[in-house]
Amino acid sequence: MTVLEQSFSLDGEDLPFQAGDTVLQAATRVGRYIPHLCWHPDFAPHGSCRICTVKVNGKPAAACTVMATPRLDVESHTEELNAQRKTLLQMLFVEGNHFCPSCEKSGNCLLQATAYEMGMDGPHFEEFYPDRPVDASHPDILLDFNRCILCELCVRASRDVDGKNLFAIGGHGIGTRLLVNSDSGRLGDTDMGLSDRAAGICPVGVILPKRRGFVIPIGERLYDRKSVSEHAQDRS
């Protein structure tokens, strides 16, 4: 059996995989959508959001960290797993301040698109309405900490690609938050630039370029035209 002939089962369908693939990587390559937030194809898996949780041979596991091997039986799109994903999404929405109608990221936001995909029509839980700052100290980039989902993509991009290590995650439990690695804690006191990988990696609306709001009209944005699962199918 060649590398490309190896396969595992995803929701009853045989999926090919390459050596070193995770379940999520293999599924994404062939256009099979497994919901996720913190995973990005250019970075090592993080496994923090748990949205990609699947059942592997009957046991729950994160699809972004489980290595694909022959004879795996993976379940993803089941009523039970999608209900769990919806609950996790609802918790993310109430834990932050996500006001989609007025957010510049609306239509391009992976959190919003995933909530639509999972049929989330309300937060269900009581809103926290946390008091979080907006950092406008940088001349070209705005940081709105209200929307952070702690995916750490900006942390990894700044450290591993830009070589600047401008962001970190600090605190514990409900107090966990995104930090700027400067003496003042302000982005304006760093050398971050718009061309940095970290400047464009945020899946929600935390890191935004200034003076570019709504350049692409609502209704013509990435997930306005097609759902997140349809985009996954297009990439195959």
Give each language-model segment a name:
Residues T2-E13:
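Eukaryote-biased recognition of intrinsically disordered, low-complexity regulatory segments
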Residues D11, A19, H46, H172, ...:
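Short glycine-rich loop/turn motifs that provide flexible caps or phosphate-binding loops at active sites
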Residues G12, C38-P41, L143, L187:
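A structural connector/turn signal
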Residues L15-T69:
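N-terminal cofactor/phosphate-binding cores enriched in small/glycine residues
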Residues R50-V54, K59-S236:
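Fe-S ferredoxin-like electron-transfer domains
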